[in-house]
């Protein structure tokens, strides 16, 4: 089985997501897209609604697929372990710290690794990352990055399950250590 799958457009991504839903071995999905894709957030969310597995990721200026730099398309990385996906976004009366304290459950405290994607232009990104580290500490493996566009305009770029968000971050926790080879 391939460790990643590239789709050049939204229709092909839709077909790929439908196929992944049938594979019981795939427990979670990482999804990365390019900001030059012709699909808007609403069109992407329509396709994401087909997914029933934990999913997280982001929109970036470029992705690497099949050893090539791509400025258009989507990349899926199927995972064989279930992730606990949590979204954090700007809310009027709830601080990021409070959101983290509420969402990081006792199960989360057993996490060995965390995927984290944050809008690079989100005003609260530094507060979020500091609070996340305060909550989970140095014993967790962190993997992720800042999503967004080289246009330096904030846009919906953080993907969590069936939706895409603008002023937000998403994490996926797993009890297994992430190994990069």
Residue spans for each PLM region:
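Cofactor- and metal-binding active-site motifs of prokaryotic enzymes
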Residues: 1-181
